[in-house]
């Protein structure tokens, strides 16, 4: 079933929340095969995960025996593995834009699940109210949009047909090829943005929480 707040934010595009139709099937098939090409679900992704774990270990060791919150470290690591496939690069944990985007994603999820914003699912027009959590939610979505669209723009400007670097490059090349053959294509930068958003918001939150629960369990039961 369609969830109003999700439908408004995603414009019914992407691969996670889009309606089942021929366009969705094409987008999902391409996304799945391309992500597998870059290692998703394969052993070839393992070196990237191991490489990122080195940064995680360094961050944890900085705290010594002091208590610390592992959430931002794990969130950074998971996001960087996704970045390596989608953007062809990782971000330093101290990168201001990267930290801001992760904070925005976390805040969007928190506000959408634990505030009056939930009422949008009953009265969709509430989404456009210019105050309170409604305004904060919209602004956070706009800021995330600006960050991701800037990444896509940078890829378009530096695109090399002979050497696609990552998911975004492959998507742009596929879009250009379809337009050249058919004159038009359902593959466009607008749809690409929502797919990248799906990868980050759905992938980062679920994987991070799974790892955090695993860390908690191992901390409470170190011998098991």
Model region roles, listed by residue range:
Residues 22-30, 48-55, 77, 100, ...:
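Generic alpha-helical secondary structure signal
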Residues 36-40, 65, 115, 140-211:
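Conserved cytochrome P450 catalytic core segment spanning the I/J/K helices
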